[in-house]
Amino acid sequence: MKRYSFQDTVMVVNGVEITGWADGDDVIDIERRNDSITDKMGADGGMMISVGTDKSGSVKVKLMQTSPSNAFLTGIMSLQEASGSLFVPVFVKFQDTYRQDLAIGTQGYLKKPAKLTRGAQGNTQEWEIVVERLDLAFGLV
């Protein structure tokens, strides 16, 4: 029998663990932005493939509005939006410590501040980090 628990997952941004996750089955969404390999079919039915060099990726996280990680990510966003040479690149590491799934994103940026929604109930804040290079390795268990 195989098992999974979100308690075995760790997400770190610039060395700080992200906490205060929202509910749902998609609170962490990590993917490459483009296909690694594309193909073209010739008029004679032969196929040619092209192996791309674009390894950029997207890392989306959904947090509760009460998550302390919102303040941390807002601080990075503020530094990135400031003029001058204060730009802070974002580095991301995700790991499932049980299965050993691993995603490492380097030289990234926060795409925009999280949307601010408030009402009678608590809400979710979603952040997207775009990285220049995203390396993925899937489970050993």
What is each of the regions a protein language model found here?
Residues M1-E31, A137-V141:
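Polar/acidic, low-complexity leader/linker segments enriched in S/T/G and N/D
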Residues Q7, D26-I28, I37, D44-G45, ...:
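A generic structural signal for short beta-strands and their flanking turns/coil linkers
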Residues G15, G45-G46, R99-Q100:
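Detector for glycine-centered tight turns/loop "hinges" at secondary-structure junctions
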Residues A22, R32-S36, K55, L63-S67, ...:
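Generic secondary-structure microfeatures
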Residues I30-R32, F91-L140:
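Short beta-strand and beta-hairpin "edge-sheet" elements
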Residues A43-S50, T74-Q80:
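Short secondary-structure capping micro-motifs at structural edges
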Residues M48-A71, Q121-L136:
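Oligomerization/assembly interface segments of phage tail-like spikes and tubes
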Residues P68-G105:
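Mid-chain, well-packed structural core segment of small domains
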